[in-house]
Amino acid sequence: MRKGRCFVPSFFAPWFFVPFVVPFLVRSFFVPFLVLSPSFLVLEAQPAQPGRVDTLRAVGGLPPETCNVFREPLAFRQIASGTYFVFDRRAHAVFSVPSSGGPPTKIVEIGGEDGRLLEPTAFDVAPDGTFAVADAPRGQERLQIFDPTGKWIAGFFLPGRAQTRISVGGLGMGGVSTVAFLGRGIALNQPETGSLITEYGLSGTPVRSIGMLRATGHENDRQLHLAMNTGVPLPHPSGGYYFVFLAGSPVFRRYDAKGRLLFERVMQGRELDPVLEQMPKQWPRRTIDGAEFPLVVPTVRTAAVDPKGNLWVAFLTPYTYVFDENGEKTRSVEFRGAGILAPSSLSFGPRGRLLVTPGCYEFAGY
């Protein structure tokens, strides 16, 4: 070794570091480029991983001092003027709330006569702000139409006695409780007629029937068969309906404006697996006015259609599935207000907000 020079072992030569430096450079520079660069947008657009649940957090809603007025807000709607409507089932009333969220005004009150409510079960609003309420004074199903101020416009009774085919939380579901208000008419689920959907004019005259009942395997038990064909008709923005079955196998159908079946889809997902596993093979019975009826608990709690025609279905478990116009599931969602919500109603307001009860919350980014 010459004087004035030091010896450098071979493992300190530059080539020695190549196996260590290259992976570091790839991880530090190349991989982030794949994820963030516009050149690789295909990677960003990959569908959500199976089992992923998106959490939507409330961005607004009615203030607590307003919500505390209501006993059981079962529906929360907003019309183009910004006014909110709250349907309070336990108070047998409908309230209007200014867009500022100020004190509510009771615009429809309790009572059995025309223009009042007794044992109400459902509520729906047309785009022009007129609304329909279903109730059952003295056990007879009735539908009433009101203007945005609560003034009575029309109403009629349906023949026969009200029958609860499905119940959850003390609320009976079926018949008038499945009302969809069309503005110039009303759509109901009445499986006892042999069809899934019956449209009525505002005078109470049947206009047309849509959809055949589904096979349930319980055709020999008429009441159970009808319960498994209980569901909600949901008008589609382009015409026709979605129909969501509330009990039994979770299924929905899509009908066009002429009433023709376009498709049927079975709703599946890991969030539903525990519910389906616990579904009874034999349903318990109960006696009402001397007649026996099956005690059926729903799988689906509520459903709604957004302005783009996507179907949102909320289950008894605190999860909601979203399906596109072709019936394909695109999202699994949970709602968070003060805590995780199990929606009892969903609606889409005129300002791009999703309105949810309980809690009268608003969500953005749907």
Where are these regions (language model features)?
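Bacterial N-terminal signal peptides
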Residues: 19, 23-40
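Eukaryotic scaffold repeat domains enriched in small/polar residues
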Residues: 45-366
